[in-house]
């Protein structure tokens, strides 16, 4: 049986429900400055927020500014993030990003997409998170959880993250855009999980169009 896409009314209901249960959630990453969030998001590729937070608790105790990272150098950065995936590439990108932040932006995190995406290791998703969380821009970052959830429940289907992002920007009401990413992260991480979604505990199961619900 063909599964039809959600209509506007049911999408709105889902967002309204999420706004009530995930009201206080912003991001799972722990940070105390714009720079710390930038580094944390750069580290989060192919790893969990829990592992990133465990790593940055130690790392930020050693250095938590661009100049601080340059002072400790590449080897120290690499050794402190060794337990994370892609640590060699990430450590190199972090050091180069710190150099650029000091040279071009006075050590501050830029507040626009073009400048953010010019930083080594900062792609569209990372830029969207920074613009959304720090600068309160109504961007929608589409990561693994958001991509899976949008396709599974029929909220916004697409074969690429960019396709899904563009659809979301068109269909999500303005008042929900600022928090959309955080809500879908929570639901995808703890309820609509990758292998065995917890459909019996899901508040949107009656609206979801996933055909293999395990209720």
Curated annotation (Swiss-Prot):
The Swiss-Prot or TrEMBL record annotates one GO molecular function as: DNA binding
What is this enzyme's EC? Answer: 4.2.99.18
One Pfam family assigned to this protein is HHH
What keywords is this UniProt entry annotated with? 4Fe-4S, DNA damage, DNA repair, DNA-binding, Glycosidase, Hydrolase, Iron, Iron-sulfur, Lyase, Metal-binding
Biological processes annotated in GO: base-excision repair, AP site formation
Give the reactions, separated by semicolons, that this protein catalyses.
2'-deoxyribonucleotide-(2'-deoxyribose 5'-phosphate)-2'-deoxyribonucleotide-DNA = a 3'-end 2'-deoxyribonucleotide-(2,3-dehydro-2,3-deoxyribose 5'-phosphate)-DNA + a 5'-end 5'-phospho-2'-deoxyribonucleoside-DNA + H(+)
Cofactors needed by this protein, per the record, are:
[4Fe-4S] cluster
Asked if DNA-binding is a keyword of the record, the answer is yes
Q: Where is the HhH domain?
A: 113-132
Which positions does UniProt annotate for [4Fe-4S] cluster binding? 192, 199, 202, 208
The organism's place on the tree of life at top rank: Bacteria
Cofactor note (record): Binds 1 [4Fe-4S] cluster.
The top EC class, named as a word, is lyase
Q: Kindly give the SUPFAM superfamilies that the UniProt entry links to this protein.
A: DNA-glycosylase
Matching entries from NCBIfam families are given as: nth (TIGR01083)
Write out the similarity annotation: Belongs to the Nth/MutY family.
The record's function comment reads:
DNA repair enzyme that has both DNA N-glycosylase activity and AP-lyase activity. The DNA N-glycosylase activity releases various damaged pyrimidines from DNA by cleaving the N-glycosidic bond, leaving an AP (apurinic/apyrimidinic) site. The AP-lyase activity cleaves the phosphodiester bond 3' to the AP site by a beta-elimination, leaving a 3'-terminal unsaturated sugar and a product with a terminal 5'-phosphate.
Full protein name = Endonuclease III
Q: Which organism is it from?
A: Buchnera aphidicola subsp. Baizongia pistaciae (strain Bp)
Its gene name is: nth
């Amino acid at each position: 049986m063909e599964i039809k896409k959600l209509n506007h009314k049911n999408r709105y209901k889902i967002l309204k429900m999420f706004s009530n249960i995930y009201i206080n959630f912003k991001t799972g990453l722990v940070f105390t400055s714009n720079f710390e969030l930038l580094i944390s998001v750069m580290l989060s590729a192919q790893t969990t927020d829990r592992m990133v937070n465990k790593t940055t608790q130690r790392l930020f105790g050693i250095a938590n500014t661009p100049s601080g990272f340059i002072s400790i150098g590449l080897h120290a950065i690499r050794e402190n993030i060794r337990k994370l995936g892609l640590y060699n590439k990430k450590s190199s990108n972090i050091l180069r990003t710190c150099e650029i932040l000091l040279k071009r932006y006075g050590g501050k995190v830029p507040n626009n997409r073009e400048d953010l995406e010019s930083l080594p290791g900062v792609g569209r998703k990372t830029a969207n998170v920074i613009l959304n969380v720090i600068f309160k821009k109504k961007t929608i970052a589409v990561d693994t959880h958001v991509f899976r959830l949008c396709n599974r429940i029929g909220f916004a289907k697409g074969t690429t993250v960019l396709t899904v992002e563009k659809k979301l920007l068109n269909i999500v009401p303005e008042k929900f855009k600022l928090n959309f990413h955080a809500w879908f992260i929570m639901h995808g991480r703890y309820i609509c999980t990758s292998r065995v979604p917890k459909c019996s505990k899901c508040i949107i199961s009656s609206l979801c169009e996933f055909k293999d619900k395990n209720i």
